[in-house]
Structures are given as C-alpha cells and as structure tokens.
Swiss-Prot record:
GO terms for cellular component: extracellular space; plasma membrane. The reactive center loop (RCL) extends out from the body of the protein and directs binding to the target protease. The protease cleaves the serpin at the reactive site within the RCL, establishing a covalent linkage between the carboxyl group of the serpin reactive site and the serine hydroxyl of the protease. The resulting inactive serpin-protease complex is highly stable. Expressed in visceral adipose tissues. Keywords: Glycoprotein, Protease inhibitor, Secreted, Serine protease inhibitor, Signal. Adipokine that modulates insulin action by specifically inhibiting its target protease KLK7 in white adipose tissues. Residues 364-382 are annotated as: Reactive center loop. This is Serpin A12. It comes from the Eukaryota. Belongs to the serpin family. It comes from Mus musculus. The record marks 378-379 as: Cleavage.
Amino acid sequence: MTRMLDLGLFLAGLLTVKGLLQDRDAPDMYDSPVRVQEWRGKKDARQLARHNMEFGFKLLQRLASNSPQGNIFLSPLSISTAFSMLSLGAQNSTLEEIREGFNFKEMSNWDVHAAFHYLLHKLNQETEDTKMNLGNALFMDQKLRPQQRFLNLAKNVYDADMVLTNFQDLENTQKDINRYISQKTHSRIKNMVKSIDPGTVMILTNYIYFRGRWQYEFDPKQTKEEEFFIEKGKTVKVPMMFQRGLYDMAYDSQLSCTILEIPYRGNITATFVLPDNGKLKLLEQGLQADIFAKWKSLLSKRVVDVWVPKLRISSTYNMKKVLSRLGISKIFEENGDLTRISSHRSLKVGEAVHKAELKMDEKGMEGAAGSGAQTLPMETPRHMKLDRPFLMMIYENFMPSMVFLARIYDPSG
C-alpha cells in the first residue's frame, strides 16, 4: 500500500485599517513572467476578479449560516490565490473540483493562471501612503522530489518562494514557517502554524498584508464611546469615529441596505454596507457578483455625516472543513490526484488554515501620521451610522478586485 503524505496549506490575510488540463498544455507559456504578463493578463484578470468576488460572497454566506451571530473577516483573494497555485499540481476530478468551487470553470486553466500572475503584479505596490504585499511560499522537505515543471510554474507565475526544509525536525520547521509569515505580515500575524502533522512533506503558505491611509482621516477628537446594537435588547459600548465628508452613497431598495464608499489614498476603497434593521440575513443571501456592479451604478456623491466604529478583530478558519462543504474535498483525500506536484509520491492536503486580522482606526491602516480636510458643497448632510451589524469590502479600484471581506457583528471583538 502506498503511504499517503500530507501537504499543509496556511493562508494569512492581514488588513490593518488602523491575509484535467484539457486546454493546451502550453509547456512554455510561463517560461518567463514577462511573457505571462503580456498574454491576455489584463482581460483575464478582470474576469477572474469577478469570479473571485462571487467566491468570496459564497464563502461569507456559508460562514454566516454556520455562525449567524459572529464576526467574519477573510481575504477571498488570499485563499483563491493559494488554491490556484496548488491546482498547478492537480489533475482530473481533483482539478475540476477546484475549478468548480472557486468559480474558475468559465475560464481555461491557463487564463486563470495568467490572470493571477497579472493581479499579483498589479496589487503588490508600495508608496508613501499605501503598501500591499501578496505572496506565496513553498516549504518543501529536502527529500521530496517535486516535478520541475510544477516548481517552475509556481515560481514564474505565482512568484512563490521555494524553501528547502527538514520536516524530520518539526519543531524548528514550525518556528521557521511562523517566522516567515510574521516577517511578511510585519509581525501582525504570529504563530500561524500551531502544529505540523508527522508525514508532512510540503507546506504551502499564502500571505497578504495591506497598510494604508484614509484619503481624509477621521479626527480623533471626534471619536466618542457610543452604543452598538448587536441585536434586540443587547448592546455593546464601542469607540465611534465621526466625520462629515463628500462620499459616494446609495440605497438598494431590493436588499434594504445603504452603501457608502470611503477611499484610501491610492487605488483602494472600503465599501460599507448597512442593512436596515432586521435585514442582515436578506442582505447576506442576496450577495452575488452582479450586486457589486449594481451598487456602483447607484452611487452618487453626497455630503454625509458618517459614524464608523474603531475595530480590532481576528478570525481563523479551518478551510478544509469550509471548502469541503462547498464541494472541494478530493484535494484533502487519499484518492485525490496531485501527481503533477510529484509523480513518485501520493499526496493530499492534510491541513488548510486561513487567518486574518482587521484593525481600523482614525488614520487608516497602521496609524500612519497625517491629516486632511475636504471642501464640501452647501447641502444638508445625509447620515450613515454603523451602529448595528454591517458588511465591509476592501477592493482594488481598477479591476475591481476584492481583497478583503467582512461581516462586523460585534465590533467590541
């Protein structure tokens, strides 16, 4: 009997608002990152961004049904990037489950990989006001002999770091991986890997780090402790930020919710979606990729008095359990097909963990210094007070590509 050997998959999402190849095989398609970038990357990336948004909504709906009264925070982009990279090593029904579950099925395999390459290239950015870092790493046992083609594609398409590791020394391997993730997320996500199962021969990690500043920062002097209404008869006290500004705002009568966008400096925007009282479930059930485009079409500039709670929440998810409920199971089973990673060993994903942290305050992300003020037209301000459960999306404007997705049920943590 062939002994099964485990792959570990760890995904770290961090937001500090203060983680059957039947198309042509195209063996030389990704020989150089430049060629990938030129190969329909932009068009494919926009299509992929829409599918990734749909996957994110589907994932939030699943998590919300399991935990109707809890906070949810995750990075759909981080999760889908890691599994897309892993799909380079999958075949047959194992590959098809990934394509179906992550909404890749309307695109060819190579279009998906070209799109991720383009997104990684565009999203990784650093300016004085904004820093986004999205990346991957493969920690491989020194004795594993992976297929060179898989390694080449993981490196050239996903820019994955390759780290040779001694999985016979599990304690030091665990420390090395946690040190790596902590470094990549600027010490925001620590101790990601709690343990490593014996028999593990490869661990795939994906991380995402985002730091930025609100285009117009909130004045800390305006922040006051106020009530947040979790449910009927239950409230918590939270520090509530306030600002009057000119914002894109809309109301969706079909889903009974108000939409407000607050931009960061650069090309990133936060969308806050506040359901009417008692309409949170209706809103969650109505989430789909088309709804985002609908909201964008409804938005118009308004002077708004906006109240936003300061936040610090952390979420950890067993993605093996969650994805299995979305029909992605073979990759975790002994009968899965990951022979494009290594034809000499039987492999399965033994563990998949996603951890994300959200911190939001007056300055934006990670407390960058600075200030700003808007010149506002003379009109009676609208009101948007996030004092009951709401949804939040952080997205890149150009695609648009959803980076983070949250349901804030209790901002006190």
